[in-house]
A protein has these predicted regions:
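Structural motif
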Residues: 2, 56-57, 83
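A generic structural motif
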Residues: 22-26, 80, 150-151
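Rossmann-like NAD(P)-binding element
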Residues: 48-75
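ADP-ribose/adenylate-binding Rossmann-like module
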Residues: 78-94
Length: 257
């Protein structure tokens, strides 16, 4: 299959490496310097080169801020039956775009962002496939993710956003709360160092990505749960209530089983 990848960042390069030995792959990035380390693939410096390539599948790996713009820019260079696909962690605007674009589409969310996951060993990672997509496109990505030994779940666009509010917004907010009051320690403990490492990883992410994940309409409710839990903990600590602390810790242990 002829596959065009938009964006030569970490995830675009990952999919290029993954697919280029089984498919004819081309990769485009508006910054040609980012194409220097791609191999076994056509490297396009201009979208005009896409016309002759005539891809059957387009994988949009542009940063989340430019996902829809990247589709819009390439649209006139694609055959009418080309399948559009995105791997964005934030799906805002995509259901409406796909409904109006006239192309078959598939939307997935590989939940192994390059900041924390080892892209050479993804056995314990997860991927979401959006159920509204094209059957052929869904089958293609399901096969890829199965070969990577990922745990695969299928959600609607709406259920995806609810899940992301829980699985990303809560840890993002908790990490920001920690980093917001963090001070440099000359001799930090193990727990502090681990939290600091996570905070540094999160802060290396694109500001727009972090913002859009936190701006998920479902996030305020999840933040409210964090605030309630912290208020409860603060009351327990302030009152030095050993029985309440034991009950609180027992509940937390039950949550992480």
């Amino acid at each position: 299959m002829k596959i065009l990848i938009l964006g030569a960042g970490k995830m675009g390069s990952f999919f290029c490496d993954l697919l280029s030995f089984d498919h004819e792959v081309a990769i485009y990035d508006p910054d040609p310097k980012r194409l220097r380390f791609t191999f076994n693939a056509h490297r396009f410096a201009s979208l005009d080169e896409v016309d002759a390539f005539s891809p059957r599948l387009v994988i949009n790996a542009a940063t989340v801020k430019y996902t829809i713009e990247a589709f819009t820019n390439v649209m006139t260079h694609l055959p009418a039956d080309a399948i559009l696909s995105d791997i964005a962690s934030v799906k805002t605007g995509l259901p409406e775009y796909y409904a109006a674009c006239g192309h078959p589409y598939v939307s997935t969310h590989p939940m192994f962002g390059p900041t924390f996951a080892s892209l050479s060993n993804l056995r314990n990672e997860n991927a979401i496939i959006i159920s509204e997509g094209d059957d052929l496109g869904k089958a293609f990505f399901r096969d890829i993710y199965q070969r990577l030994e990922l745990n695969i779940v299928e959600y609607t666009f709406a259920a995806h956003d609810e899940t992301i509010a829980y699985s990303l917004s809560i840890p993002f907010a908790a990490t920001l709360a920690f980093a917001g009051v963090m001070k440099h320690q000359a001799a930090p403990g193990t727990t502090f160092k681990r939290h600091e490492q996570i905070a540094r990883g999160l802060m290396s992410e694109d500001d727009y990505l972090v913002s859009e994940i936190l701006f998920n309409p479902n996030t305020p409710g999840q933040l409210g749960r964090i605030v309630e839990s912290l208020n409860e903990l603060r009351t327990i600590v302030r009152n030095r209530d050993s029985a309440a602390m034991s009950a609180y810790l027992a509940r937390v242990r039950e949550n992480i089983r």
